[in-house]
């Protein structure tokens, strides 16, 4: 069975798009808003609106560097929208992120911005750089009670990494005032991908430890107590990873990486959904977190279903289902990294690399049965190779942004390649990327066999 989607080639708009992680949401006006990112020093991220009823795609900002009031001929671009996109009182909120990951650009980077977008007028609001020279990697969320934004600010410059660390910041929506709530962790650099802000205004989060191991953090859950104005750490409370479909233990070596790799609030913000899959401890279940239940005993964490390995490729329809994308075979899903295998030549792919769209009920009393909506193909029968940005609504619309095999040079990504990127993918255990990503000169662009596409399907 196939799941046929309608896809749009984004590299026909900007040649430099080369990937997208997070940065997609459905809004109250029925549209899907999303970012398109690049590692090129010649262009920043773009911001789009897609209306599913008419399939109309609108470019809201071709280069977020300009929205931020910066000149990419003088400073590195704001190359990514890597954050969640959240909505409050008719506004969307998102953050920019550094994408030129080499020393000269890192040292010249101005810092990540928090951006608002008003749905009714199309007006942008720039809250400015949160902390000079620091990026936001990558969480943002809103306290709808007290009208505050929270972001996770991360150092990249060597001196800042050595002498400082990551910070939790709060922004007042009305005034734009920024408050540094403290370093998290107290020592070392951490990353945080998702927040959950509950109905009391408390901000809950974990630290993503795959890039930068933190020996002091093994399955910790953090809480900013809004009434006390203090950050609390619940040590070692995150569940130990188990594998689908029968609960076999995840590899012991992954235990130190336990963290939320995806999280979304349930209606009313009393609870949230979360996963701790690929690069997050290896757990293969969908969970509900309820902060009103006992955290230390584990009672606050309730498993819903075994879904298999996932990373960012999940979407909650804000009603009763979670959609997710993964390889057909569960063992392949936990073994192969699509961010790497998307650049493999076909003869080096010795597994079924067809991605499937699946879904599961969010009802804890349901049977946890997975619906496989089929192999994802588009209207022109392209092959899809990576999805790490998704959204869904309660009308059966599912939206995806990812990498597909290009059928022409116009569809292909003109991607920026530098040695540290190749080293990173090789160190992860995927040296075959060198066959397609190798370039004769370091720091240069290369036309790839894949391109970036936005895709939409209605599952109802």
Give, region by region, the residue ranges found by the protein language model:
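Beta-strand-rich domains and repeat architectures in extracellular enzymes and scaffolds
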Residues: 9-45
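Repeated scaffold domains used in trafficking and secretory/extracellular systems
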Residues: 18-23, 67-84, 133-141, 187-197, ...
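Blade-loop segments of beta-propeller domains
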Residues: 20, 45, 54-99, 128-138
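Residue-level detector of Asp-centered blade-edge/turn motifs that repeat once per structural unit
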Residues: 26-29, 87-89, 142-146, 197-200, ...
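Conserved beta-propeller blade signature
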Residues: 32-35, 92-93, 148-151, 203-206, ...
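Short, conserved, GDST-rich strand-edge loop motifs in beta-rich repeat architectures
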Residues: 37-45, 94-111, 152-165, 207-219, ...
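Loop/turn-rich, solvent-exposed surfaces of beta-rich toroidal or solenoidal domains
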Residues: 262, 274-277, 305-362
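Blade-level signature of beta-propeller repeat domains, shared across WD40, Kelch, NHL, RCC1
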Residues: 384-460
């Amino acid at each position: 069975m196939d799941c046929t989607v309608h896809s749009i080639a984004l590299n026909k708009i900007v040649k430099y798009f080369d990937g997208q992680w997070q940065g997609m949401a459905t809004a109250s006006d029925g549209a899907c808003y999303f970012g398109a990112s690049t590692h090129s020093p010649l262009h920043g991220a773009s911001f789009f609106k897609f209306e599913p009823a008419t399939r109309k795609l609108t470019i809201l900002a071709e280069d977020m560097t300009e929205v931020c009031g910066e000149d990419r001929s003088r400073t590195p671009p704001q190359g990514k929208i890597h954050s969640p996109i959240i909505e409050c009182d008719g506004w969307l909120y998102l953050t920019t992120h550094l994408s030129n990951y080499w020393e000269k650009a890192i040292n010249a980077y101005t810092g990540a911005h928090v951006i608002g977008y008003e749905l009714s007028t199309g007006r942008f609001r720039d809250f400015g750089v949160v902390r000079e020279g620091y990026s936001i990697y990558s969480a943002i969320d809103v306290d709808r009670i007290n009208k505050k934004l929270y972001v996770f600010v991360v150092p990249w410059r060597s001196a800042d990494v050595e002498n400082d660390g990551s910070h939790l910041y709060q922004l007042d929506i009305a005034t734009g005032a920024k408050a540094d709530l403290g370093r998290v962790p107290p020592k070392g650099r951490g990353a945080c991908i998702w927040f959950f802000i509950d109905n009391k205004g408390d901000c809950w989060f974990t630290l993503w430890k795959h890039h930068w191991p933190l020996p002091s953090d093994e399955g910790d859950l953090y809480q900013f107590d809004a009434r006390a104005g203090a950050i609390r750490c619940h040590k070692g409370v995150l569940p130990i990873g188990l594998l689908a479909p029968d609960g076999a233990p995840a590899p012991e070596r992954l235990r130190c990486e336990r963290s939320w790799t995806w999280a979304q609030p349930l209606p009313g913000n009393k609870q949230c959904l979360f996963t701790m899959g690929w690069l997050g401890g290896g757990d293969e279940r969908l969970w509900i977190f309820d902060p009103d239940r006992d955290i230390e005993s584990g009672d606050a964490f309730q498993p819903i279903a075994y879904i298999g390995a996932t990373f960012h490729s999940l979407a909650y329809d804000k009603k009763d289902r979670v959609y997710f994308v993964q390889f057909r075979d569960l063992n392949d899903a936990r073994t192969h990294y699509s961010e790497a295998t998307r650049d493999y030549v076909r003869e080096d792919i010795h597994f079924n690399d067809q991605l499937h769209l699946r879904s599961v009920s969010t009802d804890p009393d349901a049977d946890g049965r997975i619906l496989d909506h089929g192999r994802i193909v588009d209207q022109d029968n392209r092959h899809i190779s990576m999805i790490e940005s998704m959204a869904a609504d309660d009308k059966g619309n599912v939206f995806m942004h990812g990498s597909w095999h290009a059928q022409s040079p116009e569809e292909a990504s003109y991607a920026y390649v530098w040695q540290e990127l190749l080293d990173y993918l090789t160190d992860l255990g995927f040296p075959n990327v060198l066959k397609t990503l190798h370039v004769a000169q370091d720091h240069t662009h290369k036309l790839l066999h894949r391109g970036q596409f936005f895709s939409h399907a209605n599952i109802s």
